[in-house]
């Protein structure tokens, strides 16, 4: 029966596949750095989105699979496109970009506020950052995926944010932007060396706004290795 063999080959990546994902991640981080530079008061969303896409292309990307962008109230669109809306100081930005290299796709998303964040926005963002940093502790070979999901959800529960946590915090990556595994809190499968995954940690419809974190990792014998180090550095730093 070939299907289980093919599924296993898709879930556990070869060294060459990991190298392609790492390069896609590098290009995505280059693009996101430019997005952060252009997401300023008075600029349209399309300018920041276009700057990110152009920088990723200049870094070697063969395709931008998608660009999700929303500022202010538009963060609630979840997967909305960039528009001509003018961004303003104090608005939160939700922006995700999926970058393809040699057929392999890495996605990055870092939630932030233009200008100075309010105390409420800082609390909201730091909850997301804490959940993402806690997730790191469970990205090890032999760890049950459901345990990772439960511990991410526990962070949201601690702060009374469970009702804004609408879907599981991780999926696989590879030839598709999102592919197996898709763990939830009941998953019994274990992480294995060579698996490549993307965090998808989000809160939607909270009074402070809506946003999401996406960053890529390869599971190694020593734990998670970032495929998108520019984003990992920002999240680890927090506010």
Stretches found by the model and what they are:
Residues 1-239:
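Active-site neighborhoods and metal-handling regions in enzymes and metal-associated proteins
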């Amino acid at each position: 029966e070939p299907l289980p063999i093919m599924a296993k080959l898709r879930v556990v990546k070869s060294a060459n596949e990991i190298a392609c994902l790492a390069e896609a991640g590098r290009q995505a981080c280059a693009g996101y750095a430019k997005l952060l530079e252009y997401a300023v008061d008075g600029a349209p969303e399309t300018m920041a989105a276009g700057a990110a896409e152009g920088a990723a292309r200049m870094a070697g990307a063969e395709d931008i699979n998608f660009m999700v962008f929303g500022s202010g109230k538009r963060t609630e669109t979840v997967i909305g496109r960039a528009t001509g809306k003018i961004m303003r100081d104090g608005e939160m930005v939700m922006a995700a970009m999926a970058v393809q290299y040699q057929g392999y796709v890495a996605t990055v998303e870092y939630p932030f506020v233009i200008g100075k964040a309010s105390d409420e926005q800082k609390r909201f963002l730091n909850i997301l950052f804490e959940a993402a940093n806690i997730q790191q502790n469970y990205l090890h070979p032999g760890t049950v995926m459901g345990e990772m999901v439960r511990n991410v959800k526990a962070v949201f529960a601690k702060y009374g944010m469970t009702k804004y946590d609408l879907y599981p915090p991780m999926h696989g990556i590879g030839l598709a932007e999102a592919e197996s595994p898709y763990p939830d809190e009941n998953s019994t499968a274990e992480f294995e060396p060579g698996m490549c995954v993307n965090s998808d940690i989000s809160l939607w419809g909270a009074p402070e706004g809506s946003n999401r974190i996406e960053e890529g990792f390869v599971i190694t014998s020593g734990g998670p290795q970032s495929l998108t180090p520019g984003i990992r550095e920002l999240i680890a730093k927090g506010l």
